[in-house]
Amino acid sequence: MRAKAASGKAIIVLCLASFLAGSLFMSRTLSRSYIPEEEDHHLTKHLSKHLEIQKDCDEHKRKLIESKSRDIIGEVSRTHQAVKSLERTMSTLEMELAAARTSDRSSEFWSERSAKNQSRLQKVFAVIGINTAFSSKKRRDSVRQTWMPTGEKLKKIEKEKGIVVRFVIGHSATPGGVLDKAIDEEDSEHKDFLRLKHIEGYHQLSTKTRLYFSTATAMYDAEFYVKVDDDVHVNLGMLVTTLARYQSRPRIYIGCMKSGPVLSQKGVKYHEPEFWKFGEEGNKYFRHATGQIYAISKDLATYISTNQGILHRYANEDVSLGAWMLGLEVEHVDERSMCCGTPPDCQWKAQAGNVCAASFDWSCSGICKSVDRMARVHRACAEGDTPLANFRFFV
């Protein structure tokens, strides 16, 4: 049996139902397909933001680490600078302390000197120390027989003119031995020695010079302290008159200034063991007064006495003294009348009215064969009695 043909209305209703069902299905399908895309977008955005935050954190950490590193480096640098500054401060304080100690010693020294001046120190114009040795008795006799006053005349110029003249000598390596006894006997006869607490020796002249100034300043309150060798001829009147021209000036270092070669070769006379301190081989010494005769003012002699323990001594005593003067505010006076030659040089100058303060032979670092020639030099170059008689020293 055949089924009945569907009516037209039924077909239309069925079509509409199918269309609606299809539309509904497609709508759900499309809706479901778009949701994950939206979620992906949100997730990507979230992850990106998280990564940016992480990046910011890392950058912050990096900057923090760099900042800390810079701070550490800066702190190390500041600490280093602080240490350096502290070292400089300590060095300055050490220098100031040393200066203060020296000042205290100097103040005590001057206080003691002032007290002694009132009790026993004699105020004089110049102390003239004649450097001599145990073996030089004949030289001393030649000096006594010519330009050096003796006996009552020695006492008179000391009292009236303020001029003290003494032979300067230390002691032998054997205290109380034959050499010391010989000097004791000679001094007992002439009373013209200044004894030092020093063991005599040619290579100890720098020490002897230092001790001479120290001893002389402790015994006499003088305006000038002179050192002269026992083979040099001196005109006392001309010497003290020359010194008097500089009496009002502070820190005077006077003599014939020279600059000789630094001798590095061993075995030669005047060899300088510390030659390397003066630069390259062939260099010369700094300018200093030749050792035959020179003078320094009271303040410089006092400086040597006060600081004697730290004054470096070179092989040659005149170089040592020059080195002590070099670092101070000192007036170097190049006085050529203190280094005239022996006759005919000093004789011609005397005849021309330019009497020499001292005469010697450069070639011998003193008068050649002075024992034999001192009297001859004195006859030709002596100043006479007038210059010394006319000299006046006011206390």
UniProtKB/Swiss-Prot annotation:
Glycosylation sites: N117
Pfam family, any one: Galactosyl_T
Needed co-factor(s): Mn(2+)
Main localization (coarse): Golgi
One Gene Ontology term from the biological process aspect of the record: protein glycosylation
Enzyme class: transferase
Keywords recorded for this protein, A-Z: Glycoprotein, Glycosyltransferase, Golgi apparatus, Manganese, Membrane, Signal-anchor, Transferase, Transmembrane, Transmembrane helix
InterPro entries noted in UniProt: DUF4094 (IPR025298), Glyco_trans_31 (IPR002659)
Cellular component GO terms, alphabetical: Golgi membrane
Coiled-coil regions listed in the entry: none
Pathway: Protein modification; protein glycosylation
Record carries keyword Transferase: yes
Chain ranges passing through the membrane: 5-27
Family indicated by similarity: Belongs to the glycosyltransferase 31 family.
Function (record text): Beta-1,3-galactosyltransferase that transfers galactose from UDP-galactose to substrates with a terminal glycosyl residue.
Protein name: Probable beta-1,3-galactosyltransferase 8
Organism field: Arabidopsis thaliana
